[in-house]
Regions:
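Assembly/oligomerization scaffold segments
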Residues: 1-94
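Second-shell loop/turn segments in exported
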Residues: 98-106, 135-138
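Short beta-strand-centered interaction patches in the first periplasmic/extracellular domains
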Residues: 83-85, 89-92, 124-176
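Glycine-rich, acidic and aromatic/proline-enriched surface loops and short helix-turn segments
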Residues: 77-80, 108-125
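Generic solvent-exposed, charged/amphipathic alpha-helical segments
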Residues: 56, 113-117, 149-152
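Solvent-exposed, flexible loop/coil residues
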Residues: 15-23, 99, 108, 130
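Extracytoplasmic/secreted envelope proteins and their assembly/folding machinery
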Residues: 71, 110-113, 145-148
Length: 176
């Protein structure tokens, strides 16, 4: 059974739900596939569900109850003649905001991450296992997501958000 909430809506008809979690990818994702029509009436979901709408996906069995399996935001809505697909992204969606161009010199990774979270409105704590200092780090025509991706690519770290805490750790290290 399921309970899927998007913005102010609760979805009844669902064709398929795929949830993908991986610390190797920056964000966890969920893909929700919905029928395009019900009782030969077009649902026009793309007019009701918008990018940035909150998404909570509860899945389970009647015997054991529902469990929150995914929480995040609608990243995009796509339609074809058969179905509507909602591509959703976890809390890292909030990092898809443009950040002001900036040049940092001699900045620790933790301080850089603090500056990054402050640039998108703050409210995050940082859990970082790395101690290094960047000689130079540039934000140029980028989003906070782009900056995190660059950090992840450079050091191979596991990067994820958990309860408003941004985690950056070596791949083999188990944290939070």
């Amino acid at each position: 059974t399921h309970d899927i909430r998007i913005g102010d809506y609760r979805l009844g008809l669902v064709e398929k739900v795929d949830i993908h979690r991986s610390v190797e990818l920056l964000a966890d994702t969920a893909t929700i596939t919905l029928p395009e029509s019900e009782y030969n009436q077009r649902l026009e979901l793309e007019k009701r569900i918008k990018r940035g709408d909150r998404v909570d996906i509860f899945l389970g069995y009647k015997e054991t109850g529902l469990v929150l399996e995914f929480s995040g935001y609608v990243q995009r809505v796509s339609t074809d003649k058969r179905s509507t697909t909602l591509i959703c992204e976890d809390e890292l969606f909030s990092f898809r905001k443009a950040i002001t161009n900036k040049l940092f010199k001699k900045i620790s990774l933790k301080k850089l991450l603090e500056e990054l979270t402050k640039a998108i409105g703050g409210g995050y704590t940082i859990s970082c296992s790395y101690e290094w200092v960047y000689e130079k780090f540039v934000w140029h025509n980028a989003t906070a997501y782009d900056a995190l991706k660059k950090i992840q690519e450079e050091c191979g770290a596991d990067v994820y958000l958990k309860n408003k805490e941004l985690h950056i750790h070596p791949p083999a290290e188990k944290m939070g």
